[in-house]
Regions:
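Proline-centered helix-kink/hinge sites
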Residues: 48, 58-61, 156, 162, ...
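Short acidic, glycine/proline-rich loop/turn micro-motifs
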Residues: 18-20, 91, 139-142, 167-169
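A short beta-strand-to-alpha-helix junction
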Residues: 27, 91-104, 147-153, 165-178
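Glycogenin-like
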Residues: 1, 20, 159, 172-177
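Active-site-proximal alpha/beta segments of enzymes that process anionic O-linked groups
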Residues: 1-77
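Short beta-strand segments
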Residues: 50-57, 98-101, 125-130, 158-159
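Histidine-centered active-site microenvironments of extracellular/periplasmic hydrolases
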Residues: 67, 116-165
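A long, amphipathic alpha-helix that forms part
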Residues: 31-43, 75-126
């Protein structure tokens, strides 16, 4: 990656870990999606390809760009480590998390619009899968750094089949694994 990355220097745990393994941090999702957009636009064969991305803005400390919308309030900067931020900041941290999701949802929507412009959307299998949930002290710990409770293990999966597929859309509300 040639663009900018971010690393929350206030989070000593991840900052120290990243320095030890000599990585520079996370790539903002806007840049990840722009690289994906350019890659797809330059494909010769837009009928058969695989693209996998790992979006990071919804991971602690919930990256928000300067242009990000913040409908969930109150919300401000806060100090704290992954898995060890002060309980008194729970509402602020949760709102930052929700704002990060709100903005990532808009980024994914824009990527879907791009796939439609490229005439790829109707024929593609498109999946969005969460890697973990997030806790906000419901069971005495934050983030996903403690015991396995629903808050940290329950996540989502969205699967959009190609239009010509014979698979019928469904909403599944019971636990499954991926």
């Amino acid at each position: 990656h040639q663009g900018k990355t971010y690393l929350d220097e206030k989070d000593d745990g991840f900052a120290v870990f990243a320095k030890k393994i000599q990585t520079v941090g996370s790539i903002p999702d806007t840049e990840t999606l722009e690289v994906a957009r350019q890659w797809v636009a330059n494909l010769r064969d837009k009928k058969q390809f695989f693209l996998g991305m790992n979006l990071q803005n919804t991971h602690y400390s919930y990256y928000l760009s300067e242009e990000a919308e913040m409908p969930f309030q109150p919300m401000r900067e806060f100090e704290g480590l992954f898995g060890a931020w002060p309980r008194k900041n729970m509402e602020i941290v949760r709102n930052r998390y929700l704002n990060a999701f709100y903005n990532v949802d808009k980024l994914i929507e824009n990527f879907v619009l791009f796939l439609k412009e490229e005439q790829i959307w109707d024929d593609c299998l498109f999946m969005v899968v969460g890697d973990n949930g997030e806790a906000f002290y419901e069971h005495g710990y934050p983030n996903h750094a403690g015991p396995m409770h629903d808050e940290v293990t329950r996540t989502f999966a969205l699967i959009k089949h190609p239009e010509k597929s014979n698979i019928k859309p469904a909403t599944i509300s019971f636990p499954v694994s991926h």
